[in-house]
Amino acid sequence: MYNNNGFHEETNIDESQFTVEKVETVLKSLYFPQNNDYSALPQIQQWLIQFQKSFSSWSIAPLLLMSNIKEIQYFGASTIENKIKNNWLSLSQDMKKEFLDNLLLFLKTQITKCSTVVITRLCLAVSVIACHSTTDLWANPILDVLQLSFQDINNLDCFNPNLVNLTLELLTIFPEELTNADYITQEKRNKVGLQFNKHNSKVFEILCKIMSLPQNQQTLIFMKSSLKCFKSWILFDCSPREYLIDSDLILKCFEAVSNNPKLVEDFLMVLDEMFTFMGGKIFRSYTSAFSLVLSRILMIFPSFYILALQEENQIFNQIFLLFSHIAENHIKTLLKNPELSNNFFKALIQMALKGDFETCELLSPVITEIAALHELHSTSSTTEATTTTIATTTTPTTTSDCDISGWYQYLGEMVEVFRLKSMYPLDKDISDLYEEDAEKFFAFRVIAGDSVLEVYNILEGKILQQLLNSLWSDIQSFPTTKCWQSIEATIYLLSCLSESITEDTEFVPQLFSILGQLPIQSTPLIKSTMTLAGNYSNLIDKSTIFLEKIVKDFFPAFENPDLKSVASQSFLSISKNSKCASILSNSITQLISLCAPILSNNNKILDDPSNFNILEALLYIISTLPSDSQVLNYSTQLLYPFILFIKNYYTNQLQQQQQQQQQQQTELRLLLSSINLLTKFCKIYDDEQVNEYGTTQQENNNNNNNNNNNNNNNNNNNNNNNNNNIKPVFEIINNIIPIYGELLSLNTLESSIIEAISIFYKKAIMINNNHQNITNIPEINRQLTLAFLKHKPLSLVLSTLSISIVNLPKEQHLDFLADSLSSISSKMIQIWSEKSNQNNKKNNKKINNNIDIDNDNENNNNNNQIQFENNELNEFKNLKISIYPDITKEYFTMITQYIRYNAVSIPQGVISHLFSIILVNITKIHDKVTARACFSFMALIITKSKEMKSQIKWEPLLNEINGWLSIHGELFIKQILYSAGGGIPRSVVQFISEVIASLVSSYPDVFRISALKCLSVDGFPSSNITKEQKEKFLNSLMLYRSKKLPLKIVTDFSLVSLGIATNQ
């Protein structure tokens, strides 16, 4: 708790209370309380936090390192690191120099007396100094560190072995710390980086020397540390030429590792970074080095892989991961070297066959990269053919560079690997596995199915024939030489191909006929066969007899607890295919009759997800009936018991029947399930998915309507169902809405029920929108607004209201929308009010055209340095807009929808009041969720109002924003700059930058004039930033004048203002 990276020195601390003896005594009380009494722990922690914030800690913390108690040493080291990171600039130049010299001296002379974690902390502290002070205080940190152990860097044969590890530790941490340092500006980072890079070659030379040493226990430690250091400098993005071409380092590493398996793990990390850094950038310019390194890998690592498997050493996974990453990041480079790529894929597949299924998962991204290359080849071939037709003299394209035909054999072998690894265990039942292992196995089968499908999309008939041949062979050999597990794995993978198989489907009836004759009592095999039937519904929809036979076979399975779940899912999958559903609809009466035992009991349906699936499947089949009356009658027959239950629930609540708690919970659960069922019913008639802005996938992808025509065959024709039989759905929804209105009007209602109703209304709104029917939306809006005001405020209610806005006429004033926003805004102010959170008896105040909010004179003891003298602003000082981040987020998202689609329905005064609320409370917004919601809202409306200034309907809103800025603009900009300069946590500065960008782009003159006035004041936003630095910041902002203002401009301003960093 007290080792906090965010503490800053305070000047009002009594320094006299801190002595080294007192700090040690307090630390002993913390770590070793007498009689295990921890009652004083909070006071001890607070005292230690004060100590770390004090200036005395600069002199006392180093003395704690001399303690013989390791916990006290660690506290001292942590304090030193954090002081340097956050308060280094508070020291004078002489004090900095003395502190650095003493720290380096301690490391050189006392290293053997400290634990490893303490040394690491102190090395981190030194690296932070290097980031802060390179060039101005510490001229050559890399050179100085090298000379700790190699005093004459031109004679590497002479070195101090006692300090080699310290040198390597510092060399490892320096580039890592500089890369990740969030306490220096980008300009400073670049300066330090240039200085570090001057000595790259010497660093690699020393690492090469260490990797060449004769191996013993001590040098083995040096080598492991050297490999870690090597990895760090690779990630520092120094020139690859220095360690691939100009140095023998990589070769020396291979030599050392080949002689000692103990170095394999560390070298694997080096190689993995080398092949993956920035998407494989290192080897793009050094293909000869790629071939050399990969050849060496193929020489030694497959044997290490086998050895690790034999010893059950998990390092075999890391070896396979390296091979996978090589293919992922360098697939094109492999393609250019056929001999090397053949050896690579042979080794990869052999390792996969010997490894476990978790290792084989790593083949999946390899296949994805090959598939992408194949797609590129296909596209290039088409383009080349077109170009050749137009102009035969055109230079040939490089389609051969993407031709993967030479790898077809390996793709087929990968499919076989996935098939073998997808088999159920041969020596035990899957139920005997630990739950975690079983989950991993089934997750792998999903990955295997996806990967085989990718290969099928490349080779199509070859892969299908390969799987069918395997299946026929296994069936013929069963049970003599083949087991059901092999048959089941093949069937499972065949089912995964269903969405891509559109031709040559004659094998499907034959397949089911043969499978039906197998004398096997294996539940997994039966399950996979049923899944196959469900997935291949798009291929069997032309055969009425065959389809009805498959569905009829499901009904006995409904009575088997082990098969019921998969049978019901397959029945639902088949029913979702409109052609299959249409065929089955001819027998709907018989199907309902067969399901009668399930449908006869509401509780039985709602308590069992499988029964739920069966009922949903019947509703899908009903949706394809030819007449509206049939759809309405059969749907009502199935749904009426549940609608009646919901209505009776409301009646029972009104009568306040005395019920046992258990009975109440049962009824509540059944009520929730009934609402969910009705939502599922609506979903049948709407396959559009709603995004976070309330728009549909169709709306977002108007230009992609012709893509993926052969995919998702089970749902291709759902829209036809919607269009043909939508009137009965409207009738049922119309009957449900008043019932839900009664439920929402109850004085008490569980939040889960309100959320379920909100989800139903989301789906109902989308159905209305798809068919230009918006008559229900005003009533839905009214109900949800009432629910938000009457019951516990829920973010999901606001989310549904947001979607309702999208589906209403655009830019047309609607009274119910204005009333809704007015009431909800008042409720939000009540939620944010501290007083209302303590006492909910406060009356709801409604915002109208003359918004009237009672002035609260209580002072919140606000610590803001900016004082608000305006009474209008003072009344908002006691609000806590971060108290419920999710609700605040959805509220501002809802207003964003108003701005985007119906700004004319925003009551006058709401936006200006919200701006005032945020203005006053900016410095109290500490969480990212609230910050993103508030500042994105402000940035959008500032930008949008200016963009829409020519629109007459936007004139009132634009006038309101301009009027507010004319009154509070200077204070607003001052508060924004104060916040960016350290008034709010650094984690949310990125969102403040959005507001700055909107002001700079939409109101550049207003912003510049106010910013100049604020920044010209000495000490604003802090005394750490100079006048020249503030001028540079403002000039950088005005230079861009766009909504895409670089974040680093604002973050650098924040770091400098906080005194954490300087550009010098």
Curated annotation (Swiss-Prot):
State the UniProt keywords alphabetically.
Cytoplasm, Nucleus, Protein transport, Repeat, Transport
Q: Which Pfam families match?
A: Importin_rep_3 (PF18806), Xpo1 (PF08389)
Concerning InterPro entries, the annotation shows:
ARM-like, ARM-type_fold, Exportin-1/Importin-b-like, Importin-beta_N, Importin_beta-like_NTR, Importin_rep_3
Keyword Transport belongs to the record: yes
Task: Name the residue ranges with Low complexity bias.
Answer: 700-722
Q: Which SMART domains match?
A: IBN_N
Q: What is its main location?
A: cytoplasm
Question: Where are the stretches annotated Disordered?
Answer: 695-722, 839-860
Q: Which GO terms describe its biological process?
A: protein import into nucleus
One GO term in the molecular function aspect is: small GTPase binding
Give the signal sequence positions: none
| Coiled-coil spans in chain | none
Q: Where in the cell is it found?
A: Cytoplasm; Nucleus envelope
Segments forming domain Importin N-terminal: 40-109
A GO cellular component annotated for this chain's UniProt record is: nuclear envelope
Explain the purpose of this protein.
Answer: Required for nuclear protein import and mediates docking of import substrate to distinct nucleoporins.
Q: How does it assemble?
A: Forms a complex with an importin alpha subunit.
- Family per record: Belongs to the importin beta family.
The protein in question is named Importin-13 homolog A
Q: Which organism is it from?
A: Dictyostelium discoideum (Social amoeba)
Q: What is the lineage of its organism?
A: Eukaryota, Amoebozoa, Evosea, Eumycetozoa, Dictyostelia
Gene name, Swiss-Prot/TrEMBL: ipo13A
